Amino acid sequence: MEIQFLGTSAGQPSKSRNVSCTALKLLDELNEVWLFDVGEATQHQILKTNIRPRKVTRIFISHTHGDHIFGLPGFLSSRSFQGDGGPLTIYGPAGIEQFVQTSLKVSRTRVSYPIKYVVLKEDGLIFENNLFAVYTARLDHRVPSFGFRVVEKPRPGELLMDKVAEYNVPNGPLLGQLKAGKTITLSDGQKLDGRDFLGKERPGRVVTIIYDTRPTENIGKLADHADVLVHESTFNGDEEKMAHRYFHSTCLDAARIARDRHVRKLYLTHISARYTGKAGKELEHEARKIFKHTRLANDLDSFEITLRG
């Protein structure tokens, strides 16, 4: 599992930052990539990475402001042009389907794959398979805005090889089935329950994505004990009143959530163009006074999300 920042600017691009997009790479787990918001020129940013558009199977849109969605039509078109793209699901507030369909219709663009739309209305579960679950909750912005919590389901414990050796389980399919927690039958007819040969179950990883919002209780619920919290940091701490007036957050707001909700790592994104160079690093330094495991995200930064313990 890996997270990569394709755009980290707020409102409009700057010379060093594109507008919002974060990629969650689940290649080892699902052979998929999920995108969170698709700002203008996201497809150009992708060209600078190893992400293949056909691997993108799910797109989560926080809200319908232009700096978070203007890259969608172009990306969808290019994904079709490159071929081999399977079905795609877009999760977002009301209006996202109309925006996409109107853009494609006016530009006479035809995509070669089905697109499913899931309209975000209420807090709760919006996706689940055998490995992951995704939850959403309403944030506090000028338009309907949602945060996301991606939860990896618990992983089976390690295979207890010393115990396996006692029963002379041969290498091959039987050992693999045992590792998967299944019951196997040995050549002498003896049955072994795989669950008895596994160590303690390991907790899965949790990734929380919070874009445009001012502080609200739901952020804490989504961020609780997350391994990674990606949080908007449009302004520094001195601009708190202005930030909240415009329905945004400061680097200190993000740091307090990370500290109070026992997050492992905080990444600051959605940075105002006023914070360039040293001013940008000051956001990081300021936040670290509250939560030391803070990092200012830059475009194309990529980080592995490791398992706990």
Curated annotation (Swiss-Prot):
Q: What class of enzyme is it?
A: hydrolase
Keyword Transcription tagged: no
Record-listed Zn(2+) 1 binding positions: H63, H65, H141, D212
Q: What is its EC number?
A: 3.1.26.11
Paste the cofactor note: Binds 2 Zn(2+) ions.
**Keywords on record:** Endonuclease, Hydrolase, Metal-binding, Nuclease, tRNA processing, Zinc
Gene Ontology MF annotations:
3'-tRNA processing endoribonuclease activity; zinc ion binding
Signal peptide positions (record):
none
Q: Which family does it belong to?
A: Belongs to the RNase Z family.
Assembly and binders: Homodimer.
Query: Matching HAMAP family, A to Z?
Result: RNase_Z_BN
UniProt cross-references to NCBIfam families, sorted A to Z: PRK00055.1-3 (NF000801), RNase_Z (TIGR02651)
What this protein is called in its record is Ribonuclease Z
Organism per entry: Lactobacillus gasseri (strain ATCC 33323 / DSM 20243 / BCRC 14619 / CIP 102991 / JCM 1131 / KCTC 3163 / NCIMB 11718 / NCTC 13722 / AM63)
> Per UniProt, what is the name of the gene that codes for the protein in this document?
rnz
